[in-house]
Amino acid sequence: MALRASWKGFLTVGALSCHVGLYAAASTSERISLHMVNRKTGHRLRRQYVDEETGEPVEADAQVKGYEVSKGEFVTVEPDEIADIVPAGTKTIAVNTFLACTDVDTAYFDRPYFLAPVDEPSAEVLKLLAAGMSERKVAALGEAVLFRRVRRLLIRPVAEGGALTACTLNFDYEVRSAQEQFADVPKTRISGEMLELATHIIRSKPGKFDPSAIEDRYEDALAALVRAKMEGKPLPKPEPRREEKVVSLLDALRASAGSPDKPAPKRAGAKGKAAGTKTAGSKAGSAKAGGSKATGTKTRKAKSAAASAGAQTRRTGTTRKAG
């Protein structure tokens, strides 16, 4: 099913212009959703705004936003007052700068979108732009009024396909200072055996990012739990947690490097061993990826089974009895 555009407008780069849409590249809609339910009746609960002091429900026409200036004291802001301060939008993403893809700290990344054409003439312009950016290995910095605010977007070419992605960027005041966060971390110099072991471990575990190998174990467990309850089967038992022994940093490095009693070999002498480790790691990675896909399939089957069981339960009227 084709995605629905979150925004439509024009992308302009100098004299070039094309009609584009922003389509959300990530979504949580496939996750299992749980609702609040009355335990006694089985009916779904609904939220209601009540006055903090009187406890009385407040009708929609009496509700207004407010900024708290002191404890219990608010300055109210009317909807039309907010509408008046929204920047005038031109429905245009204006690109004014090209820069290296690595120039923007990932802490500024907000939400990812697919930047796609909405007609055939625009598709040709976008492909041309994507090809040029890929050739130069650069990203574009654009600006547009999105969802009431003037937002900056980092536009990057997709590795394959001649397409573009756009990521809204956090404002500078929203990104916390790394210097402040790490100000209390003691400055120490790491050298000798500890550094050799650390670099050996890093060299022995090369790989590539594979999103399919990342398992959402909570989602899988939740699907299994819901399915078991709907089918009246025993609930799955949690796996016992292993108690980790507290060891020194050096001992932990030695154990990770597979050398508990002596330092890791020098880089030149470790080629054969590293190569062997890489092969084993590749097999393990393949097995893990395969297991992940199987797990994902089981999750989808669990959701499908849950949906089917839910429909059957609603027909027989046993949902509320199950709790």
UniProtKB/Swiss-Prot annotation:
Q: Which InterPro entries match?
A: Ku70/Ku80_beta-barrel_dom, Prok_Ku, SPOC-like_C_dom_sf
Q: Quote the biased-composition stretches of kind Low complexity, using this chain's numbering.
A: 271-297, 304-323
What does the record list as GO biological process? DNA recombination; double-strand break repair via nonhomologous end joining
As one GO molecular function, the record gives: double-stranded DNA binding
Q: Does DNA damage show up as a keyword for this record?
A: yes
What single Pfam family name could you report for this chain, choosing any that match? Answer: Ku
Record keywords: DNA damage, DNA recombination, DNA repair, DNA-binding
Q: Which residues form the Ku domain?
A: 12-197
- Specify where the region named Disordered lies, as residue ranges: 255-323
Q: Member of which family?
A: Belongs to the prokaryotic Ku family.
Q: What does this protein do?
A: With LigD forms a non-homologous end joining (NHEJ) DNA repair enzyme, which repairs dsDNA breaks with reduced fidelity. Binds linear dsDNA with 5'- and 3'- overhangs but not closed circular dsDNA nor ssDNA. Recruits and stimulates the ligase activity of LigD.
Please give the subunit comment from the record: Homodimer. Interacts with LigD.
**Listed name of the protein:** Non-homologous end joining protein Ku
Upper taxonomic lineage: Bacteria, Pseudomonadati, Pseudomonadota, Alphaproteobacteria, Hyphomicrobiales
